[in-house]
Amino acid sequence: MLAKRLVPCLDVKDGKVVKGVQFRNHEIVGDIVPLAARYAEEGADELVFYDITASAHERVVDKSWVSRVAEQIDIPFCVAGGIKTISQARELLAFGADKISINSPALTDPSLISRLQDEFGRQCIVIGIDSFFDASSNSYKVKQFTGDEAATKDTQWFTQDWVEEVQKRGCGEIVLNVMNQDGVRGGYDIKQLSLVRAICDVPLIASGGAGAMAHFRDVFIEAKVDAALAASVFHKAIINIGELKAYLAAEGIAIRR
């Protein structure tokens, strides 16, 4: 059995790490490099950095902090934010990122996924999907430009359909960001993640809702995800990554130690 991964997420805005609730009302929680170093030391398996306003503001992630992070940590990390071209992706990988993630740009131009995969290989192409449960239609729908509340918009895609589409186009991993659960610490959306797991043949990373150690156990066992991403519980020191790994190992979950 492949070991499950724990992935702290650092949302970046104006050069600082921020955290919101349901993708709104972001507050500053710290500086990028010290937080990254702390999580690496605690035992994180990898890190994800989202420049949350890059796509909405028509720019690409700031490469200066990417290189500083690469100098300070020795675990893999992924960066996202406004990546729309092969050359932009190449620059970020050259600055030290191990993977690049695309979200809104892929919705604008789905062929970008295939072109990135052809150039760099499936293993370093991650697709982020911001999924919102629409109670009025009892369906999961994909949102775009979610890093800026004023710019957020609906798309034509239902979540399950987009999951299948990005796999056909060559993505290597999928991060499912469950917007309704984001930042509220009520647990991962096991139902939605299980539906996606059933149609997802690439590694699936759960995102949105972690509030207790048991939530990580439940999402690994019940939704069978490959990795669990979390932010506020780590930023606010509610959960220590090393202690979480010990807990999960005691619960019989294969975890990297």
Swiss-Prot record:
Q: What is its main location?
A: cytoplasm
Could you tell me one molecular function GO term of this UniProt entry? lyase activity
Catalysed reactions, semicolon-separated = 5-[(5-phospho-1-deoxy-D-ribulos-1-ylimino)methylamino]-1-(5-phospho-beta-D-ribosyl)imidazole-4-carboxamide + L-glutamine = D-erythro-1-(imidazol-4-yl)glycerol 3-phosphate + 5-amino-1-(5-phospho-beta-D-ribosyl)imidazole-4-carboxamide + L-glutamate + H(+)
Annotated EC: 4.3.2.10
> From what superkingdom does this record's organism come?
Bacteria
| Subunit structure, interactors included | Heterodimer of HisH and HisF.
What is known about what this protein does? IGPS catalyzes the conversion of PRFAR and glutamine to IGP, AICAR and glutamate. The HisF subunit catalyzes the cyclization activity that produces IGP and AICAR from PRFAR using the ammonia provided by the HisH subunit.
Q: What is this protein called?
A: Imidazole glycerol phosphate synthase subunit HisF
Protein species of origin? Shewanella putrefaciens (strain CN-32 / ATCC BAA-453)
Taxonomy of the source species: Bacteria, Pseudomonadati, Pseudomonadota, Gammaproteobacteria, Alteromonadales
Q: Which gene name does the record give? A: hisF
